[in-house]
Amino acid sequence: MQHKLIAFIGGGNMAQAIILGLLKQGYPAEQIIVNDPNEEKRAFFANLDVATSENNVGSAIKAEVVLLAVKPQMMAEVCSPLSAVDFSDKLLISIAAGISTERLNALIPSVKSIVRVMPNTPALVGEGMAGLFAPKNTSENYRTFAQDLLGAVGRTVWVNDETQMHAVTAASGSSPAYFFLMLEAMQKALIKMNIDEKTARELVQQSMLGAAKMVTENPQIALSTLRENVTSKGGTTAAALAVFDAQHFNQTIEQAMQACLSRSQEMETLF
C-alpha cells in the first residue's frame, strides 16, 4: 500500500477502526492526522503517536488524502470551510451514509477524485464489509489507495452505479444490526427455555460464527444447499423452518432491506 498523508476529519468509531487497521498493517503513524473537537478522542490518537488537530482546513491543505468521517447532518457545516482548499490534486473519501459524490462535488467544487464508501461496524474487529463507488474521473491510483485503505479493516466491493450504494447500505451497512437482532431474539427464547443468559449467548453466538465460517469457506456451495444440508425431513430443524415460513420470514427480510434502501435514498435529499 502506498503511503500518503491522510487527514481524517472526525475521529469516531469508524475512523478509529480504519486507523488501528492501518497501523496494524505497518502504515506510518506520522502519515496520519486526526481532526476532532473532542479532547478525549484526540488524546486516544496521540497515545498511538498519531498527530491530532482541531484545524480541519490546515490539515486538509497538508494532506494528499482527506477522509470525511462525520455524520451526514454535519457534512455541509464541515465542508463549508474546506471549500476554500484546492482539492484538485487530492483524494476525497467520504464514509457518510446518504451523501452522494455529486453533493460532495457541490460542497467542495475543486475536488476531482472522490471515493464514496459504505463501511460497517465489524470493521472494528477487522471483519468489515465496505462498498465503494468512484466517479469516472477518479484516478486508478486513488481508487487502488481507497481500496487498500478500507481493506485494512475487512473486505471491499466496488459498484459501477452510485445508486447501488443504497442497496449496499441495506446489504452490509445496516445488516450487522439484523444479525444482532436475530441473536438477541434467540438468546431471549433460550432464557425462556431455562437456559441461563451467559450459556444462551455462548450457544447462539458460536452457532452464528460457525455458520458464517461454513459460508465463507465453501463459496462453491449455494446458501440454500447449506440450509438443506442441516434440515432432515420431519426433523427438529424442519419444524423450526416451517414456523419461519409460516411467519413470512423471507418477505419480512426483504421488506426490512427495502425500508433501509428507501431511507438511504431519502437521506440523499435531506443533506
UniProtKB/Swiss-Prot annotation:
Q: Which reaction does this chain catalyze?
A: L-proline + NADP(+) = (S)-1-pyrroline-5-carboxylate + NADPH + 2 H(+); L-proline + NAD(+) = (S)-1-pyrroline-5-carboxylate + NADH + 2 H(+)
Subcellular location(s) of the protein:
Cytoplasm
- Gene Ontology terms describing biological process: L-proline biosynthetic process
Transmembrane ranges, per UniProt, are none
Query: EC number(s) in its UniProt entry?
Result: 1.5.1.2
Per its record, what are the GO molecular function terms?
pyrroline-5-carboxylate reductase activity
Q: What is its main location?
A: cytoplasm
- Root EC class: oxidoreductase
GO cellular component terms, A-Z: cytoplasm
Q: In which pathway does it act?
A: Amino-acid biosynthesis; L-proline biosynthesis; L-proline from L-glutamate 5-semialdehyde: step 1/1
Domain of life from the UniProt record? Bacteria
Keywords for the protein's UniProt record, in alphabetical order:
Amino-acid biosynthesis, Cytoplasm, NADP, Oxidoreductase, Proline biosynthesis
Gene3D superfamilies annotated for this entry? Answer: NAD(P)-binding Rossmann-like Domain, ProC C-terminal domain-like
The entry's function note states: Catalyzes the reduction of 1-pyrroline-5-carboxylate (PCA) to L-proline.
Family from the record: Belongs to the pyrroline-5-carboxylate reductase family.
Protein name, entry field: Pyrroline-5-carboxylate reductase
Provide the species name. Answer: Haemophilus influenzae (strain ATCC 51907 / DSM 11121 / KW20 / Rd)
